Every structure is written in C-alpha cells, then in structure tokens.
C-alpha cells in the first residue's frame, strides 16, 4: 500500500503556571516539526496545555485576555503576512472578527511563545479585512515560516481537516458538537453519545541501504527527476518494523533487515504521522510492482553532489534520512 507522502518528492521559554479561567498550564519540553534525538533548528515553544481543555470557560477567558493571539484559518488555509519576514497574521481578542465568531468554531491550541493561542475556524464565506494579509496553503509556507510557526500551522491544519471530516457521528449519523476546547467531537444524539478524537494515520518512511548505496524511488506525480525515500501506510495489526519490511518488499522487491528508528514528522495532508527508519538490504535487485514509477540504487557520491532537483526538500523527513545516511558514511555534517 503505497503512500504518496507529498514531500514534493516528497512536518522561547514556555510560561509557568499560566491560568485558563482557573486551570493551570504546566510547562513542557520544546516542540518542533521533529520528534527525534537529533532535532532540527530550535523552534519556539508550544505548550499544548491539555489540562486546560476541560475548563468550560476557556473561550471566555481567552476573549478577556488582551494577550491572546488568534490563528485565523478558513477551510485549510491560513491568514499570512508576506511582508518580510513571512509570518502568521495573528489577530487579537479585540478584533471584531473574533467577537462575532461562534465559540464552537474556536479551538484552544495552547500557549505559543508565552501567550495563549486559539485557532479561529472561519466560515467559508467570511472575508476578513486584514491589511497586508491573505489566506495561503500550508504546503507552500513550511519552508518560509519560522520553525515554531510552521509547527503551529501543522498542528492547526491537522485539527481543521479532522473537524471538517467528522461533522457527523460515524455510528448513528447525527451531527457532532465540539467539547474539550475543540479537541473532541461528540455525537449530539443522547442515545448514542459516541466521541471522536483527532485522527492520525501512521506511515513509515525508510532509507534503505546496502552499505555503499541507498535505494530511492519516485512517483509519477512528482517533479521530473526527483527521488525520495520509500514510504507507505501502516496496516491494521502491523508493527512499524513489519510495515517497513513489507512496504520495501512490495514496492521494490528488496528484502531488508536491521530496521532502525530515526525520527518522526507530522504531515497533515491529510492526517499522516511520518515515522522514519533506516533499514539494511540483504537482497538488492529492484522489481517494481507498479506503485512507483521508478526505484534505483544511488551511490554515495551521487547523493553527496546531487542538486535540489533530485532530492526532497530540506524540511522533509525524507531529506533528513538521506542526509543522516551521508553523514554516517562520511562523517560530514549536512
């Protein structure tokens, strides 16, 4: 089961004890696009404050706080200022757009850069007048935004997609309504009461090596000449390691062992969590099954000297897998 993981070849100190209408937000570890022992560039801290989601007065507390920042989204697009530097066009709680927005269309994201941050999910026909700002898609923004803001939009987009796809109960078909500050959708049918949480689709992405070479593939939809690490969704009842072995075999006919976890990256297009691995190939002939347009072995020097047209973009876990393999073979920093 191939995954077009769409990597185009292909995701400050926190406040201490910030209150949410009586709730207390505890500090946590810095968050970024990466979850790994080898982090990417340092990101601004996001504290999700899960305990604050249970406060029924959270939306009113956010409105009453002049420091609250609202991340404005419509469908899956986000309000952005392009004037250098490119950044999220946050609005304050005093903005008329916020005052008119139903609380059911708001989601508490947590605290970002020491300030409360709320996702405002605008109706499709809303056209806010914010000078110098426009709605843009996340995919084009990831390489342009500061690391922390890119991570925040990844988080917001995942919630937006889930909310748009879970408007009705999957058990009885009744409408759903948000709870837990927007992080839970509950069936409104009292005799049903099913609850739904944000969906995450785990997918493996793996850099296969036989020692001196690395195996990369390409999909037909990618830019000409671009190759990337192999990827696919994890199936029901399957371990991550088994998914790596199966996907590589299905897509290329290559047998692998020695599967080693590397890092993870959220990729909300629409709801993937990319789990990166290295694997060693002990049978190397490539036999395509039709899921990929091509797959081939690349020598170390080919990848060391490759231009950007060949490699996946720098912000993707696919690129980091390739760079980590080069570093392991040569000792060079990417």
Each predicted region: which residue ranges?
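Cationic, low-complexity basic patches in intrinsically disordered or flexible, solvent-exposed regions
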Residues: 7
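Active-site-adjacent beta-strand/loop module that shapes the phosphate/pyrophosphate-binding cleft
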Residues: 265-287
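Nudix hydrolase/Nudix homology domain
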Residues: 17, 22-166, 177, 223-227, ...
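The catalytic Nudix box helix
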Residues: 228-262, 277, 281
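Leucine-biased recognition of intrinsically disordered, low-complexity hydrophobic segments
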Residues: 3, 15-18
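Cys/His-rich short segments
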Residues: 155-205
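N-terminal strand-loop-strand
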Residues: 185-228, 255-256, 279-281
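Conserved hydrophobic/aromatic beta-strand scaffold that supports enzyme active sites
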Residues: 108, 119, 168, 186, ...
């Amino acid at each position: 089961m191939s995954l077009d993981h769409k990597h185009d070849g292909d995701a400050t100190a926190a406040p201490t004890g910030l209150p949410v209408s009586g709730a207390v937000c505890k500090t946590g570890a810095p968050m970024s696009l990466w979850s790994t022992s080898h982090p990417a560039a340092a990101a601004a801290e996001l504290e999700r404050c899960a305990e604050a989601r249970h406060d029924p007065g959270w939306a009113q507390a956010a409105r009453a706080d002049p420091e609250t920042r609202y991340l404005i989204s419509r469908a899956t697009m986000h309000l952005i200022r392009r004037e250098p530097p490119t950044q999220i066009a946050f609005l304050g709680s005093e903005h008329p757009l916020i005052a008119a927005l139903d609380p059911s269309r708001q989601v508490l994201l947590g605290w970002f850069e020491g300030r409360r941050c709320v996702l405002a999910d605008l109706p499709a026909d809303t056209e806010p007048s914010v000078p110098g700002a426009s709605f843009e898609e996340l995919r084009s923004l990831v390489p342009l935004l500061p690391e922390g803001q890119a991570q925040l939009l990844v988080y917001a987009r995942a919630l937006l997609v889930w909310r748009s796809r879970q408007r009705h109960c999957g058990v009885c078909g009744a409408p759903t309504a948000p709870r837990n500050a927007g992080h839970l959708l509950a069936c409104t049918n009292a005799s049903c009461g099913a609850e739904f949480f944000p969906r995450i689709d785990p997918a493996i992405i793996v850099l296969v090596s036989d020692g001196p070479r690395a195996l990369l593939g390409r999909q037909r939809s990618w830019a000409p000449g671009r190759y990337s690490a192999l990827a696919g969704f994890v199936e029901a009842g399957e371990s991550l390691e088994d998914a790596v072995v199966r996907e590589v075999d299905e897509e290329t006919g290559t047998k692998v062992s020695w599967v080693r976890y590397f890092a993870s990256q959220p990729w909300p297009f629409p709801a993937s969590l990319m789990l990166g691995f290295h694997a060693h190939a002990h049978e190397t002939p490539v036999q395509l099954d039709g899921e990929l347009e091509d797959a081939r072995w690349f020598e170390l020097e080919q990848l060391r000297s490759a231009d950007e047209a060949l490699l996946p973009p720098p912000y993707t876990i696919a690129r980091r897998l390739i760079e980590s393999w080069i570093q392991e073979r040569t000792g060079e920093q990417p």
